[in-house]
Swiss-Prot record:
Gene Ontology biological process terms in this record: L-methionine salvage from methylthioadenosine; L-methionine salvage from S-adenosylmethionine; nucleoside catabolic process
Keywords from the named record: Amino-acid biosynthesis, Hydrolase, Methionine biosynthesis
InterPro entries: MTA_SAH_Nsdase, Nucleoside_phosphorylase_d, Nucleoside_phosphorylase_sf
GO terms under cellular component: cytosol
Native source species: Histophilus somni (strain 129Pt) (Haemophilus somnus)
Pfam family, one: PNP_UDP_1
Name the UniProt record assigns to this protein: 5'-methylthioadenosine/S-adenosylhomocysteine nucleosidase
CDD domains, alphabetized: MTAN
Function, as annotated: Catalyzes the irreversible cleavage of the glycosidic bond in both 5'-methylthioadenosine (MTA) and S-adenosylhomocysteine (SAH/AdoHcy) to adenine and the corresponding thioribose, 5'-methylthioribose and S-ribosylhomocysteine, respectively. Also cleaves 5'-deoxyadenosine, a toxic by-product of radical S-adenosylmethionine (SAM) enzymes, into 5-deoxyribose and adenine.
């Protein structure tokens, strides 16, 4: 099985990149792709850059060049669901854009034309993540992850997202774009993120402080998933 792994920032991929054996590195269009093996699994690890366009472009290159059987998105996220703490892990059941609005033409909030109302994560991968988390005693929350080209750093913006997407458990800036590309290419995907902040007025300071912890937690989960595939 070939596994594609996508992270936006260097800090979010560096642990996994350091574990790749027989490594080949490709730099293309601002993206970096590390190819090789982790735990006898053939992997391609993409550092896409931040935001929806960078994530979509990088994921498209990853799928075209490497042709993975599945895609895992890893990294950090802002926690929204009640009780989530820094370092906790979230897994997607579905993803939507919190900054997309074509409701004037009858689409659901967060839905784009020619796309489903939400991008559904692969149920088998979601279940696998849940089982691994349970075995490892990891606090895991599954549910809707919302993406947009904004770092949410105010209580007002967070309240708006929660009001319009009441099932949201976490927010970030790339997952739905990755999911959209995987949907178009018919590639199973799942999002595994660790919480770095809680999206309030202190989010930027929390993010800077706890990004390394979130990156370590999400990378650890990805490694455990690779062991279980």
């Amino acid at each position: 099985m070939k596994v594609g792994i996508v992270g936006a920032m260097a800090q979010e991929v560096e642990i996994l990149a350091s574990l790749i054996e027989n490594k080949n590195v490709v730099h293309i269009a601002g993206c970096t792709i590390y190819q090789g093996n982790i735990q006898d699994k053939e992997v391609a690890l993409l550092q896409s850059g931040i935001g929806k366009v960078a994530a979509a472009m990088g994921t498209t290159l990853l799928l075209q060049m490497f042709k993975p059987d599945i895609v895992i998105n890893t990294g950090s996220a802002g926690g929204v669901s009640s009780g989530l703490k820094v370092g906790d892990v979230v897994v997607s059941t579905q993803t939507v854009y919190h900054d997309a609005d074509v409701t004037a033409f009858g689409y659901a909030k967060g839905q784009l034309p020619a796309c489903p109302p939400a991008f559904i994560s692969d149920p088998k991968l979601t279940a696998l993540v849940a089982n691994v988390a349970k075995q490892q005693g990891i606090n895991l929350t599954s549910g809707l992850i919302c993406s947009g080209d904004s770092f949410i750093n105010s209580a007002e913006k967070l309240a708006w997202i929660k009001a319009n997407f009441p099932e949201v458990v976490a927010i970030e800036m790339e997952a739905t774009a990755i999911a959209q590309v995987c949907h178009k290419f018919n590639i199973p995907f799942v999002v595994i993120r660790a919480i770095s902040d809680v999206g309030d007025g202190e989010a930027s300071m929390s993010f800077e402080e706890f990004l390394p912890l979130a990156a370590k937690q999400s990378s650890s989960m990805v490694l455990k998933i690779l062991q279980s595939l």
